[in-house]
């Protein structure tokens, strides 16, 4: 429903529990998310991200979508994002997020999720600042590969991102990506 509030080409960022991406029962939800949007970035966050502020260790994901009501078929990365894979340890995990490059962590151990089900437990030893640095790097890399500027969306050319202030009269998107000192992620358009 969040995508209904976003204009064409706009961005929507979700922080969700890992269950949204990992559960085979949620495959239909992931497909619905991508029926009118493109996957710009999906990052598995460490379980200890919210420990200092909320006193909880819960696995979560950052998912960034770009509204595209006229999109065609899913690309290979989006297909992976819709699929659940069984890891060698018997755990179920999102196929795309099971790749190490999409996980922000310094340690990964077999454990359980909040419901006692077998799951990978990811932690980061460098605190919020270390986590923020890695999240920023991952998102910037993903934006360079997967973000469609208004021009490229209309012309179906290569993806690009502009990380500078642009002239709003040209109907271009201004995107500012900043990791605040507290480690919060700010996306403006």
Feature-to-residue mapping (PLM):
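Generic hydrophobic/packing signal
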Residues: 14, 26, 37-38, 134-135, ...
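Conserved Class I SAM-dependent methyltransferase catalytic core
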Residues: 1-51, 58-65
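Context-gated lysine
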Residues: 1, 7, 67, 133-136, ...
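Ordered hydrophobic segments in well-structured contexts
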Residues: 11, 41-42, 62-64, 103, ...
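Flexible, glycine-/basic-rich loop-and-beta segments that form/coincide
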Residues: 52-156
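Charged, often flexible domain-edge or linker segments that flank or initiate folded functional domains
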Residues: 144-189
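Weak global preference for isoleucine
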Residues: 15, 20, 28-29, 64, ...
């Amino acid at each position: 429903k969040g995508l209904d509030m976003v204009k064409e080409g706009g961005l929507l960022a979700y922080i969700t529990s890992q269950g949204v991406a990992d559960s085979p029962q949620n495959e239909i939800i992931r497909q619905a998310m991508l029926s009118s949007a493109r996957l710009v970035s999906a990052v598995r966050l460490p379980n200890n991200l919210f420990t200092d502020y909320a006193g909880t260790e819960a696995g979560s994901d950052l998912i960034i979508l770009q509204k595209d009501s006229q999109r065609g078929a899913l690309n290979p990365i989006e297909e992976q994002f819709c699929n659940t894979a069984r890891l060698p340890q018997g755990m179920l995990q999102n196929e795309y997020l099971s790749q190490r490059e999409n996980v922000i962590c310094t340690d990964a151990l077999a454990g359980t999720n909040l419901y006692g089900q077998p799951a990978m437990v990811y932690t980061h030893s460098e605190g919020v600042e270390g986590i923020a640095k890695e999240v920023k790097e991952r998102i910037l890399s993903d934006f360079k590969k997967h973000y469609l500027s208004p021009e490229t969306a209309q012309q179906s050319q290569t993806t690009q991102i502009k990380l500078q202030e642009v002239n709003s009269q040209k109907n271009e998107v201004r995107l500012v990506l900043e990791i605040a000192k507290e480690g919060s992620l700010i996306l403006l358009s």
